[in-house]
């Protein structure tokens, strides 16, 4: 029998209109103190894991009760995820820390179809969620009452620097970039792609965070949890395969010129990093103040290139959402996306590929970005992001039509009664196209255009593509 255990925490909210408080995210002049209440459904007598696969919290926002549903992001890390740092004498130290039982979640607000959430539950709730079209941040308060949290809007954070923050990419930035020419009708791709990414934190990051590698690691995880969520909408699985921290000094000369730094980082990645850590893309994270308003730079349309599948990103804000959006932007350039024009829209807010960081940050790509990405996939066809990860590569939650298989398997051997799968060989039976999935019926792919997932709220239906068992996400989702 399932019993619902209510973790009894006072469900109260005390708005501090017009007051100011110093938080990790900065000085906030309008916020609420809330006490989230966790609701856990466990079998009677079951031992509660440290970090459950799914969690639910009740709290008040603007005095109104909301329910936050969270699900552990099991696609965040690759199973061979590794971390590298350096001893004072320069020795390379590489470890494979256990990451399966991590504390990073994605989620939504109950009864709000347009809501999203990216939350760290490591020490209280820290992150951001979208509610009724507005972005809110949440973080624990460092008070004697450890359950108190602050909830506030991004615009209520006092800005020390009002200068615009921009990406440094221009159409003529790189001689090696040839604009993609339309040679035939564009084919909209619904196949999932997989980007295996390494983040490199330079020595200034070590100095900025007082040599605390754990803090740097946590910061990168928070950023990457949001990046992973952002790209899910494009049916791209971005997984963190490695983190390298230049703890004893930089391996390149990190300069204020973003162009020079990007070139040096790409060269180092090709001759050093790639030879010891397989990956599709690498991003350098640095507090270095680049020249002018630039906070990031990347090559355009270079995913899988040994040197140029790279970007550099300034760690310019204590708000992980802003740094995550910037890194997602630079990865977007690597995936063939150009900057949004004025007519490219995301429901009234600036989109991911806007050349300027918006006062109202968005986690959405514009339709223009989808067109750029599909065009790039059609005419450049980067091969490294086509391979479907195996369980030896990616830790991910199995979902209908998208099971992750062991090496050599075509279907899940754990289902001996499946008429489409030979349980002895883990191969599809003769004549079978598939064994399971929302678009698999009687061992055959369902016809293209068959609805496989009904829309919820203002969302859009998802359709089978006729060539796979999975139910691909509709590329026109908001």
Curated annotation (Swiss-Prot):
The active site is at residue 330. The keyword Cell membrane does not apply. Keywords: Calcium, Cell adhesion impairing toxin, Disulfide bond, Hemostasis impairing toxin, Hydrolase, Metal-binding, Metalloprotease, Platelet aggregation inhibiting toxin, Protease, Secreted, Signal, Toxin, Zinc, Zymogen. Disulfide bonds join 304-384, 344-368, 346-351, 411-426, 413-421, 420-443, 434-440, 439-464, 452-471. One of its GO terms (cellular component) is extracellular region. Its main location: secreted. Expressed by the venom gland. SUPFAM superfamilies: Blood coagulation inhibitor (disintegrin), Metalloproteases ('zincins'), catalytic domain. Its EC number is 3.4.24.-. Gene3D superfamilies: Collagenase (Catalytic Domain), Disintegrin domain. Residues 397-478 form the Disintegrin domain. Zn(2+) binds at residues 329, 333, 339. GO terms for biological process: proteolysis. Its cofactor is Zn(2+). Residues 193-389 form the Peptidase M12B domain. It is found in: Secreted. Belongs to the venom metalloproteinase (M12B) family. P-II subfamily. P-IIa sub-subfamily. Monomer. This is Zinc metalloproteinase/disintegrin ussurin. It comes from Gloydius ussuriensis (Ussuri mamushi).
């Amino acid at each position: 029998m399932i019993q619902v255990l209510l973790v009894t925490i006072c469900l109260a909210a005390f708005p501090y209109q017009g007051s100011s408080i110093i938080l990790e995210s900065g000085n906030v002049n309008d916020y609420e103190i809330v006490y989230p209440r966790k609701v856990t459904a466990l079998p009677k007598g079951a031992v509660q894991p440290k970090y459950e696969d799914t969690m639910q919290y009740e709290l008040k926002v603007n005095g109104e009760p909301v329910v936050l549903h969270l699900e552990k992001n099991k696609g965040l890390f690759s199973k061979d995820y590794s971390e590298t740092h350096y001893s004072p004498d320069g020795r390379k130290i590489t470890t494979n820390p256990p990451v399966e039982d991590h504390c990073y979640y994605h989620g939504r607000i109950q009864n709000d179809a347009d809501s999203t959430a990216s939350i760290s539950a490591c020490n209280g709730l820290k992150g951001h969620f979208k509610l009724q079209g507005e972005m809110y941040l949440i973080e624990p308060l460092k008070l004697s009452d450890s359950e108190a949290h602050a909830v506030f809007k991004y615009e209520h954070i006092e800005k020390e620097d009002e200068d615009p923050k921009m990406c440094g990419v221009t159409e003529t930035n790189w001689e090696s970039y040839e604009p993609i020419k339309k040679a035939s009708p564009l084919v909209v791709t619904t196949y999932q792609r997989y980007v295996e990414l390494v983040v490199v934190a330079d020595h200034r990051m070590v100095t900025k965070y007082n040599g605390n590698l754990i803090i740097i690691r946590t910061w990168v995880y928070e950023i990457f949890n949001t990046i992973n969520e952002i790209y899910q909408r494009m049916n791209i699985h971005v997984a963190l395969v490695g983190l390298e921290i230049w703890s004893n000094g930089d391996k390149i000369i990190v300069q204020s010129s973003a162009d020079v730094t990007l070139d040096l980082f790409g060269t180092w990645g090709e001759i050093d990093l790639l030879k010891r850590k397989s990956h599709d893309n690498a991003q350098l994270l640095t507090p270095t103040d680049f020249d002018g308003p630039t906070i990031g730079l990347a090559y355009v349309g270079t995913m899988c290139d040994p040197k140029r599948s790279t970007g550099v990103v300034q760690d310019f804000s204590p708000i992980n959402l802003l740094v995550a959006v910037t890194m997602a932007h630079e990865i977007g350039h690597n995936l063939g996306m150009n900057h949004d024009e004025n007519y490219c829209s995301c429901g009234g807010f600036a989109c991911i590929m806007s050349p300027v960081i918006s006062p109202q940050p968005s986690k959405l790509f514009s339709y223009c970005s989808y067109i750029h990405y599909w065009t790039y996939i059609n005419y450049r066809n980067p091969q490294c992001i086509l391979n479907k990860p195996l369980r030896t590569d990616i830790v991910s939650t199995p979902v209908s039509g998208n099971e992750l298989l062991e090496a050599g398997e075509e279907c899940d051997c754990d289902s001996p009664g499946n008429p489409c799968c030979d349980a002895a060989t883990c191969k599809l039976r003769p004549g079978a196209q598939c064994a399971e999935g929302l678009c698999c019926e009687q061992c055959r792919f369902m016809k293209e255009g068959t609805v496989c997932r009904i829309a919820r709220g203002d969302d859009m239906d998802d359709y089978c593509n006729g060539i796979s068992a999975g139910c691909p996400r509709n590329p026109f989702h908001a």
